[in-house]
């Protein structure tokens, strides 16, 4: 249903849209009177606009339901300025309401920072460092548990919307930083419609204010050059319609020299850094400094130059406006700079930047730094810039969401790690990274923090500690540290581990047994199908004098489905054990299951004793090998080395590459 004229005239959203469009249409149709443009836009809004019905719910106020329209909600937001959550939840700001639980969170945040500060005064391999690192992690867990509790129905302050708002805001923030990094570092925020270009154009030529004169840099006068750059910036070729061509052409041909220059350098980092002014500043930084390890503690003798580099970059390169479809872009679009996204972090590829400085600055600056320090200085130059960039970005995000200035500074991202190499996987939150710097401090070779592993199976709970340590060593020494990866060396070490597992199992050693978190029957919906339940059940039936108490984490022997006749064959040698197996296992409450499937899992008590000799011949060696080495499969898959299946249970790594 068309909008009535009064609603068009009184809607803050529509009137704001008209004001924006007037600016654009005056460029597209310079001879058309502004009054006619405004009238036409108002007519379009009235004939094509729809005021969608909306509902505002407050479940802190007896589930109050307010039925309204989307335009009225927008006007209310503009007038009342509530804090906007990531999922459309509105909050009163701290000047209008107080929250005791918020003070608890702020207290925990302050405590965590204090622990981190104290931690960093100690050597990274010391007991004190580990203690304060553990304490700051505990504080973080407490903070996150408070957030999560709001989504738990049993919590006194449970709210249907609050937990989702926290998650939605975090997702919105991380996607906002990701697309901004893509745009800033690699000009990779493509236009998905001509409307996006028009908004981009309007922000640069009409909305933004600038500190420096465009005349300080090479002036761009070639309109075709600017047009070609942005015409090739559409996400897909089918967006390059005749209408889009006409609009872009008219807008760019309406530009002054200053507007062309500012359009050319926006999100065009390397072109801008190649200008004489920026080259002089960058070479000056490298000529004057002897070491630049921490972007948050710039050496005094280059502070002025670094501040000026950022000021120029902020003025000419950084586009500090929201991009549309941020979350969708994050999930679906091909990225160039943001190579890994974790819950609250973006990991960015800065190799192009380091290569750029290596080719244009290192030698030309006359720097006396060695290659390592030149690399660190290059890394921290861009870290300094992106730290300032993301600070400005998040400040504007908070302002747009009506967060009070004094609270906005709490939403921030910091540069924490410099990873020299990363091994990625085709699964989210799974990577291995060789750490060189943490907050400016060099991570020594052999330090516990040298290799950061997240999400890979061989580091997860339940994996044998011996296997985990050996596979970790292969990853570190054969893949992450070397400049070139030797596949033959990796396979040789894996083969050695496999032979060691086989030899160990044949001798009844528990060294390479799987580790399971065994629980009572009530913890499982179908306990009879869970190896973690059946394993201690078998042990307790056979060895009641050394009973296992659950819940507990236990070493578990994988058996090859031992059937009743095989057990009966041992009656002469192990009469008591066989009798108990017959009575309590094969003919006990779960007898039918054991008679059909056989004995597959046997738990061992945490005494350190070896596997009882009675079971040695029944150990499923192939399955145990595959289950242990299989935890390394995602690492090898990242190197395009697949596991080869041989038989039902046995897998091994071959020397065949997936290409």
Segments (PLM) and residue ranges:
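Conserved acidic
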Residues: 1-659
